[in-house]
């Protein structure tokens, strides 16, 4: 991590002491679970995406997250306005380029958003490989590439765009183009619950709002909290249905000691 005196647990404590308002421009599938994940973690989500107000709302939020899962021309206008406002206000923002490789509209839209210099990019391995110009095996919104194959692409992407890149999957990888960490944990049931990855993007935004001066630390902390909650929930259930609500309970029950004792963060 960038700052060895900052732990994931201490950032969770700081976030809950001053819950950040996070504008989550996310897809229709993810809105409900993402809002619940944010509330369980201790943040304040706002699912505001309309072009007419997205920029104004971004200016008063602690952070912005943009997810292109259910993209349209109107949504893109709102995303662009919000990102511009976040930049002007000095607020961190996170880009989640969901299945950007799938259509020309998505590719053009992500290229436009990248020009606005996201603070953090979070995606699965296939998305990150393709975003760096490689050939991925993504199928729709699902990754068919292991995280390990995306690590080099993540470093290149971080260096090119001067951003933090997080590749999430069975094991997560986070880099600023120089330093890097792996985060182990979670549960094999997590990919069977829709929109958990999209929800993680929102949580990254919440931690970034808490520590805007150290987005690498913030990203690692968010992923560590998610992994510990997923691992705890996975030990209590037999399938994805019960996992979804157990995960929210586990996330709400996390505290500083639990994360710092159970998180498996490996600095590379």
UniProtKB/Swiss-Prot annotation:
Cited HAMAP family: Thz_kinase
Pathway where this protein functions: Cofactor biosynthesis; thiamine diphosphate biosynthesis; 4-methyl-5-(2-phosphoethyl)-thiazole from 5-(2-hydroxyethyl)-4-methylthiazole: step 1/1
Molecular function via GO: ATP binding; hydroxyethylthiazole kinase activity; magnesium ion binding
Gene3D superfamilies: 3.40.1190.20
Name of the featured protein: Hydroxyethylthiazole kinase
Entry's Gene Ontology BP terms: thiamine biosynthetic process; thiamine diphosphate biosynthetic process
Family: Belongs to the Thz kinase family.
SUPFAM superfamilies: Ribokinase-like (SSF53613)
Function (record text): Catalyzes the phosphorylation of the hydroxyl group of 4-methyl-5-beta-hydroxyethylthiazole (THZ).
Its EC number(s): 2.7.1.50
CC cofactor: Mg(2+)
Top-rank taxon: Bacteria
Coiled coil: none
Pfam family, one: HK
Gene: thiM
Chain residues that bind ATP: 122, 168
Recorded catalytic activity of this chain's protein: 5-(2-hydroxyethyl)-4-methylthiazole + ATP = 4-methyl-5-(2-phosphooxyethyl)-thiazole + ADP + H(+)
Keywords: ATP-binding, Kinase, Magnesium, Metal-binding, Nucleotide-binding, Thiamine biosynthesis, Transferase
Binding site for substrate: 47, 195
């Amino acid at each position: 991590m960038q700052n060895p005196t900052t732990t994931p647990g201490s950032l969770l404590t700081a976030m809950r002491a001053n819950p950040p308002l996070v504008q989550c421009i996310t897809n229709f599938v993810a809105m409900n679970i993402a809002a619940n994940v944010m509330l369980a973690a201790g943040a304040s989500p706002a699912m505001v995406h309309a072009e007419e107000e997205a920029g104004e709302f971004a200016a008063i939020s602690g952070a912005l997250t943009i997810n292109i899962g259910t993209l349209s021309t109107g949504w893109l206008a709102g995303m662009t306005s919000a990102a511009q406002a976040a930049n002007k206000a000095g607020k961190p923002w996170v880009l989640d380029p969901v299945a950007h490789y799938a259509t020309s509209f998505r590719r053009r839209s992500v290229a436009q958003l990248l020009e606005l210099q996201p603070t953090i990019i979070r995606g699965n391995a296939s998305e990150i490989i393709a975003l760096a110009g490689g050939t991925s095996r993504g199928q729709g919104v699902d990754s068919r590439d292991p995280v390990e194959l995306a690590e080099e692409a993540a470093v290149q992407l971080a260096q090119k765009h001067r951003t933090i890149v997080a590749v999430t999957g069975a094991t997560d990888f986070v880099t600023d183009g120089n330093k890097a960490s792996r985060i182990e944990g979670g549960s094999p049931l997590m990919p069977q619950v829709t929109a958990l990855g999209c929800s993680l993007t929102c949580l990254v935004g919440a931690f970034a709002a808490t520590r805007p001066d150290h987005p690498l630390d913030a990203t690692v902390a968010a992923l560590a909290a998610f992994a510990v909650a997923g691992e705890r929930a996975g030990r209590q259930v037999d399938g994805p249905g019960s996992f979804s609500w157990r995960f929210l309970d586990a996330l709400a029950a996390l505290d500083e000691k639990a994360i710092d004792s159970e998180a498996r963060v490996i600095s590379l």
